[in-house]
Amino acid sequence: MQLGMVGLGRMGANLVRRLMRDGHDCVVFDVNPESVRQLESEGATGSNSLADFASKLSKPRAGWVMVPAALTGRVIDELAEQMEPGDIIIDGGNSYYRDDVDRAAELKEKGLHFVDVGTSGGVFGFERGFCLMIGGEKDVVEHLDPLFKTIAPGVESAPRTPDRTGPPSPAENGYLHCGPNGAGHFVKMVHNGIEYGIMASYAEGLNILNKANVGKKQGEISAEITPLREPQYYMYDINVPEVAEVWRRGSVVASWLLDLTAHALFLSPDLSDFQGRVSDSGEGRWTVGAAVDEGVPALVLSAALFERFSSRGEAIFADRLLSAMRKEFGGHIELGPGTS
């Protein structure tokens, strides 16, 4: 089957490579000509503009857009100008699901089909496959099924759930038609919100282990210094990288994310290579917003999002104000840096 790919960054290029490895025909375009040439050398058909790109696709044409979120809307609009009724535009980035609903309606007026695909797998997707969460018209999604099946990890990527019998479902192969337009990115949005929460849990737990020797610190015990009492119970020099390593094997909290965490700690045990300013790409905010709209408690996901804000210095004014208030009502003086 043929697919056109617009955007040849790490994920876009690896999607193309995975498709070509399975015998699919790929037409590619990127604003960076070198990215196009690289995939041409691997067997793709290159193009030098969106018009050239569209002209090299067989009808009904399917064009997958995989560009940074800020550019997605503009690129889809420009690609739509080159497409004809019956053609399909796929958004495989991290777009807001509400934009998908509006975009699908706009494209439908032009006779174009729209499919939103939440794509998870990152830089490891070529080897591991990409988990796909899909939104769109049922018949259009079914038409694209051979592409999704190739891109997805496959049923062998995880042990089968106990008591499931019969032929493996698409979900067991790593891709799922979640519903109409917007459903794919809605599910991916919540996936990323959960990711924030899991990451925060690992970070907080391992930080508690990292501070388990706080009782060895010399100093006067007061309400300003931890531990407040019984320092003899906090004398442990825990090897945090090795804890992450042992948890990978047979523990309840084992996961691929923990595998990556263990690798990061092995490379930089004290994490001195990082400043700790944690970005958020939007999905966490959208997830919390959806929880508010639905009236659904999302305490962990909300806290994980707000911690990312704090890591970037967004709480500095509030923290200073807390110190100022303590000084006002109790005469408390701030301790110097490095005091805990």
Predicted segments — roles?
Residues M1-L8, R17, K59, K149, ...:
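NAD(P)-dependent Rossmann-like dehydrogenase/reductase catalytic/cofactor-binding core
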